[in-house]
A protein has these predicted regions:
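N-terminal Rossmann-fold NAD(P) dinucleotide-binding loop
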Residues: 21, 187-188
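FAD-binding beta-loop-beta segment adjacent to the flavin cofactor pocket
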Residues: 149, 286, 292-306, 365, ...
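FAD-site-proximal beta/loop scaffold in flavoenzymes
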Residues: 158-175, 261-337, 440
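Gly/Ala-rich phosphate-binding loop of Rossmann-like dinucleotide-binding domains
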Residues: 25, 29, 191-196
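Short hydrophobic core segments
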Residues: 13-15, 120, 136-146, 180-181, ...
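Flexible, glycine-rich terminal cap/loop adjacent to redox cofactors
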Residues: 15-41, 47, 54, 58-65, ...
Length: 466
């Protein structure tokens, strides 16, 4: 129910029209709050639709089709001299993104809340100054301004020139060779995309492994495939400087105690993103910011309780479904201060859309050890599984983590074919707090990829208490 009265223009002002902001506005409007959404970007849709999840996955799927066609002889199918039209690949991606963005624009302008195209800055804790010259007031705020590409660690890159995760998704032509700086999800996805479109790729990662937050057995599987597909990996390597050379660009690296120089036509800087909050005036009104991110509690409140922050601007988890959940929690709490909800990250999930796909939910072995959480783990390889052998998808494995005393499933990992789909069985199991005994007893159709989960479940069921 609206509580503005004569004091404020709106019950809730949402700054940012991406996934988190739209979720907050939709939830608030459904709860009867007078709501306004402010979007100051040149385009409407948010990172996921415009320059993140959707365009990258459209391109990655095209790369997968090209890879399968190029290896059709594995199934006895002749497909000689497989070629591609990169302009058509990009045109298909652009058409999809236009449709997705148009739909989001329609949702934002659908009349359930006010939608304004303007940048916003806090003049005081309850007032926003807009780039249009107007001002508006609100009882509560949700900041959902997303993230921007992080500044490069090598100052020379500004002069040399480089691609970012934003610009790499909109190239008119492919470079012949590419140096990828970074080893996180975006870096490895784009590295494999370009490599499968026959670009010579060198990937440079500071940590000992790509996807360094995950378990070493997980990242090792992906690195094995990358090397097999011709991607040159430099792990445990520090970039030192960059310069232009006659035939392209060169990066100096510190690798195994020596200086190594690698050259390519282009450099892709993919060392992450940072919260997009610099222009909001948060420090002036006392909103706590640490390490360039907005600090929130589990109710998504900032240090000023009537101001909430969700999504990438909090710097916690750059994952769309988390931003959506946070937006819904923030809006609910703005509407119902007497029965507030809080975020539960127990089912935190991440999927990396390489091939094999990498998907994790809950605890990894690394995070369980860091938290001193007792666990038992069991895994099973796709190289010994009937359906994956039929598909020639032999790389990777599934792994379960369980509480030793109760057998409750506390984590799952899938490195393998359609891992992003397969992990949802474990998400559902953990949502209902199932044990490995219950998962092992659940029927699985044969032959399917999903039945592979039964094997580690059965192994753990024999070891865990009930």
């Amino acid at each position: 129910m609206s509580t503005t009265g004569a004091k404020f223009d709106y019950d809730l002002a949402v700054i940012g029209g991406g996934s988190g902001g739209y979720a907050a506005a939709r939830t608030a409007a459904a709860d009867g709050l007078k709501t306004v959404v402010l979007e100051g970007g040149e385009e409407v849709g948010g990172l996921c639709i415009l320059r993140g999840c959707m365009p990258s996955k459209a391109l990655l799927y095209a790369a997968e089709v090209l890879h399968l066609a190029s290896h059709a002889d594995l199934w006895g199918i002749r497909a000689d001299n497989v070629t591609f039209d990169f302009a058509q690949v990009m045109a298909r991606k652009n058409a999809l993104i236009k449709d997705f963005a148009d739909y989001r624009r329609q949702q934002l302008a659908g009349g359930k809340f006010k939608f304004l195209r303007a940048l916003a800055r806090f003049a005081d804790p309850h007032t926003l100054e807009l780039s249009t010259g107007d001002k508006l007031t609100a009882a509560n705020f949700v900041i959902a301004t997303g993230s921007v590409v992080a500044p490069p660690p090598l100052p020379q890159l500004e002069d040399v020139g480089y691609l970012t995760s934003d610009t790499a998704l909109s190239l008119a032509r492919l470079p012949k060779s590419l140096i990828v700086l970074g080893g996180g999800p975006v870096a490895v996805e784009l590295a494999q995309f370009f490599a499968r479109f026959r670009v010579r790729v060198t990937l440079v990662q500071r940590s000992a492994h790509v996807l360094s937050k995950l378990d070493d057995d997980t990242t090792g599987e992906l690195e094995k495939v990358f090397r097999r597909e011709g991607i040159h990996l430099y792990t445990g390597t520090k970039p030192l400087d960059a310069r232009r050379v006659e035939d392209g660009k060169e990066v100096a690296l510190e690798h195994n105690g020596q200086t190594v120089r690698v050259r390519a036509e282009e450099i892709l800087f993919a060392l992450g993103r940072v919260p997009n909050i610099a222009s909001l005036g948060l420090e002036d009104i006392g909103v706590q910011v640490e390490d360039r991110r907005i600090v929130t509690n589990d109710q998504m409140q900032t240090s000023l309780p009537h101001i909430y922050a969700v999504g990438d601007c909090t710097g916690l988890n750059e994952i769309v479904h988390i931003a959506i959940q946070q937006g819904e929690v923030a809006a609910h709490n703005a509407a119902h201060s007497d029965r507030m909800k809080q975020m539960d990250y127990r089912l935190l999930t991440e999927v990396v859309f390489t091939e094999p796909q990498v998907a994790v939910v809950g605890l990894t072995e690394k995070s369980a050890r860091a938290a001193s959480r007792p666990y038992l783990a069991a895994s099973y390889p796709f190289s010994d599984h009937g359906k994956s052998l039929i598909m020639e998808a032999k790389d990777g494995f599934v792994k379960l983590l369980a509480d030793p005393a109760s057998g409750e499933i506390i984590g799952g990992c899938c490195v393998g074919p359609v891992g992003g789909e397969l992990i949802h069985e474990i998400i559902a199991a953990m949502h209902k707090r199932m044990t490995v005994h219950e998962l092992a007893a659940m029927p699985h159709y044969h032959p399917t990829l999903a039945e592979i989960w039964a094997y580690p479940a059965e192994e753990l069921a024999d070891k865990c208490g009930r």
